[in-house]
Amino acid sequence: MSGTKVPESVLVVIHTPDLKVLLLERADHPGFWQSVTGSKDRVDEPLGETCRREVFEETGIDTARHELTDWQLQNRYEIYPHWRHRYPDGVTHNVEHVFGLRVPEALEVTMAPREHLACEWLPWERAAERCFSWSNAE
C-alpha cells in the first residue's frame, strides 16, 4: 500500500543578524542536527504556509513576527528506500525549498518533544559542521 506524503518540503534556516543559527537534534536519530524541515500537508499548500506551520510546530516561533525569506534554492534528493512507503507509488525523490527566518536574537525555543531532543544556537560555521543533512550544511 502506498502512502500519501507529498514529496515537496521546506528547510527553514532560523538565524540572527550576526548569523547564529538554530539547530535541532532529531529525536528519531540522536546525534543528527538540522534546521527546521517539513513536508507540505497537501499538494496545493503554499510553501510559506508550510514554513509557518513547521517552524511553529518544531520551535514555537511565530514566523509572522519575523522576516521569512525564500532563498530561491532547491535541493532534489533521493528518498531513503525505507521511507518510500510514506509516499505515493513510484515516488523516489523529494524537492526541498530553502527559506531563511531572521530573528532579532537567539530566541527561547519550545521544542516538539516527539521530534527533537535538544536545540542550540551556534555561529553559522559551527552549525554547518554539525548538520546531518548535506542540504542543511550547504
Predicted regions and their residues:
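Unchanged
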Residues: 40-134
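Residue-level signal for short, function-critical loop segments
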Residues: 27, 39
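Short, intrinsically disordered, charge-balanced linker/junction segments flanking boundaries
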Residues: 14, 135-138
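A conserved beta-turn-beta hairpin within the catalytic core of GNAT-like acetyltransferases
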Residues: 29-32
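A short gly/proline-enriched turn/hairpin at secondary-structure junctions
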Residues: 34-37
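Conserved N-terminal beta-strand and adjoining loop/helix that marks the start
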Residues: 1-21, 43
